Amino acid sequence: MTMDSDNGYMAAGELLKALAAPLRIGIVTELASGPRCVHELVDALGAPQPLVSQHLRVLRGAQVVRGARRGREIAYSLTDEHIAHIVADAVSHAREGR
């Protein structure tokens, strides 16, 4: 393996680690259709607000999502549309296996 492939594998591993929670997969799926505020994610996913916020922090730290102020709220969006495709493919693959 080369240094470049090692770095690519490490980056991919970090991305997959950040996505390795069902609620985070749900958040990414919701954000695939556009920016959402925390309360919109809470309503869509049926999860408590503190838990959604905690998972958003993990996704922000992994640079999967970014936040932009929208009035008194922060609207979260995906940093890269490829992430939505990765998650959609993973969910589709998991459903096929059942």
Regions found by a protein language model. Give the residues of each.
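Alpha-helical DNA-recognition elements
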Residues: 58
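Glycine-centered, phosphate/nucleic-acid-interacting loop/turn motifs that mediate DNA/RNA or nucleotide
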Residues: 63
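Short acidic/polar alpha-helix capping motifs at helix-coil junctions
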Residues: 2-5, 37-38, 52
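N-terminal helix-turn-helix DNA-binding core of bacterial DNA-binding proteins
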Residues: 10-50, 70, 74-82
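Amphipathic alpha-helical dimerization/coiled-coil segments
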Residues: 1-11, 29, 81-98
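Short beta-strand "wing" residues that participate in macromolecule-binding interfaces
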Residues: 66-67
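Residues within the DNA-recognition helix of helix-turn-helix
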Residues: 55
